[in-house]
Amino acid sequence: MLLGYSEWYKKYLFYTMLKKEFNFENDFNELDAGAFGTKYKDVKYFGIEKNSDSKLYDQVEVLYYNAENDFAIILNTKEGEQVILCRGAEGGNFATIYNNIMEKAKTYTGNKKFTKNDFLKVPNIKFNTKKEFNELCNKEFLAKDGDRCTIEQAIQTIELEMDKSGGKLKSEAAIVMTKEMALMPEEENRYFYLNDEFTMFLKEKDKDTPYFAANIQDITLFQ
């Protein structure tokens, strides 16, 4: 999206924003604060415990469960957004991790429904981060019309919140660019405990790929 430019300086600002808000059909239970990994204490959690209302079960879809540190689930929302949570992620980047999750889900033969024998623990998440992509600065490239362009600055900010009721995401990205010419525009208990490093994806239910991904390791940055 082209917001504006200067004819004299031939400078352009490209800006895009992604904004999502989602709510769970029913609030999950607020759980006791606990540890996250071996380093962090007093972390706030929500989820499902032994005496939770069974109507919460329908909000959780099991993709697979192999062990307490190897599982993936979906938290479904009223708006059709899906919160995909995974422990034991495999892959060197988010695209590979997501594809591996989907492949493991296809071959999983266990119960994909959340039952009274299952438990869920998810940390509250709240963070605001800004990243400057300095590696892109001063890089030249040719535009479609053949004009030479240079990226002066590339910035992304992300705000994410999630608790027992739902969450919201706001992601903004801006690129400042110069151009040489003016441009025209029943089973055993399963513990789905996310109490150590885990990966999170946000996806629209009818889409094939997520629109957001994060790896949660240092929980102090997210609460």
Where are these regions (language model features)?
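Hydrophobic-core positions in well-structured secondary-structure elements of globular domains
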Residues: 1-223
